[in-house]
């Protein structure tokens, strides 16, 4: 309890002390994969202002990435666009807490105590939430509660059917988890590729396959739930100009898969634009090619 209170106090102090990240220039280069050309950051923002959903794929815990996310959203504000901010980093069951904070009914300290923020919330996501609060924009707690994801990863998708009716509303109604290209990427990331005796990657055991399948179901459940949250937020805008800007780990939206594919399934005909932020060591040696051209509509390179 003492440790929890100390951590909360520390996060509150950090949130209060953190300067708006947009105040500093962030080295970056933007590549438009549709035109095959580098463009300036503001040209990208102008294009995003015309979208109905923008999915921003981030590398977690990268400071410049988070500054660019803030710059992107504040750029929409400069264009007199009032977006909805949607975050992977908050779970559906704390939506009421978020709403109470945005309305001024609770303090920042209470938000941190009740909303289970990520450890780097003060520096990485608080600026986005504070901007939304000051402008009166909605903030969507988009993700599946992590305790449900953990149970799915442990016991499989059957655990979803054992949820109470109230808890079931916190998980997407329509759940699809096909073994497609996204599954192949997920499996590649999950599987131990240590070589066998002949130097080739060792084939996964049945147990490893079963474990991967359970973890993939947890991943799909997150993607489906975030996509459903995004679709609901988009429909709630009732035709008002400007996008739902959803921030998630890049794996969830790169290559139009995961949350991106599931959002498009729910919003056919809507303009869904994907941004992928990529920290690199050298901005002067960029030559996007191959799979990177399929990764997103806009590639935003920044310095690690």
Where are the model-predicted features located?
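N- or domain-start disorder-to-order transition segments that initiate the globular core
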Residues: 7-51
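Acidic/histidine-rich, surface-exposed loop or edge segments in extracytoplasmic proteins
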Residues: 25-29, 49-59, 107-113, 209-212
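Zymogen propeptides
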Residues: 36-37, 41-78
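Extracytoplasmic/secreted envelope proteins and their assembly/folding machinery
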Residues: 41, 45-48, 69-73, 125-129, ...
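Solvent-exposed loop/turn segments at secondary-structure junctions
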Residues: 59-63, 90-94, 145-149, 250-254, ...
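Short internal beta-strands
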Residues: 84-91, 274-278
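A substrate-binding/cap region within the structured catalytic cores of diverse enzymes
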Residues: 96-233
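C-terminal regions of proteins
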Residues: 225-245, 250-304
């Amino acid at each position: 309890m003492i440790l929890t209170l100390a951590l909360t106090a520390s996060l509150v102090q950090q949130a209060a002390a953190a300067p708006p990240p947009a105040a500093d220039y962030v080295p970056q280069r933007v590549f438009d994969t549709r035109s095959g050309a580098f463009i300036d950051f503001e040209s990208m923002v102008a294009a995003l202002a015309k979208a109905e959903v923008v999915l921003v794929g981030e590398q977690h815990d990268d400071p410049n990435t988070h500054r660019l996310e803030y710059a992107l959203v504040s750029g929409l504000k400069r264009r007199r666009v009032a977006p909805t901010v949607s975050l992977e980093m908050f779970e559906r069951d704390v939506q009421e807490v978020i709403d109470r904070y945005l309305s001024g009914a609770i303090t920042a300290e209470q938000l941190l105590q009740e909303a289970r923020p990520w450890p780097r919330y003060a520096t990485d996501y608080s600026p986005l939430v504070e901007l939304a609060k000051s402008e009166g924009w909605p903030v969507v707690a988009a993700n599946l509660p992590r305790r449900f994801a953990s149970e799915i990863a442990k016991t499989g998708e059957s655990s979803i059917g054992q949820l109470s009716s109230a808890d079931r509303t916190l998980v997407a109604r329509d759940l699809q988890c096909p073994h497609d290209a996204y599954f192949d990427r997920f499996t590649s990331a999950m599987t131990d590729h240590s070589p066998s005796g002949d130097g080739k990657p060792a084939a996964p055991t049945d147990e490893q396959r079963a474990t991967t399948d359970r973890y993939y179901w947890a991943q799909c459940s997150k993607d489906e739930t975030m996509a459903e949250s995004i679709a609901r937020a988009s429909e709630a805008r009732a035709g008002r100009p400007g996008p739902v800007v959803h921030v998630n780990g890049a794996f969830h939206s790169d290559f139009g898969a995961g949350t991106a594919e599931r959002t498009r399934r729910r919003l056919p005909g809507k303009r869904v634009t994907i941004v992928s932020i990529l920290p690199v060591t050298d901005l002067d040696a960029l030559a996007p090619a191959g799979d990177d051209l399929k990764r997103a509509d806009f590639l935003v390179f920044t310095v690690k």
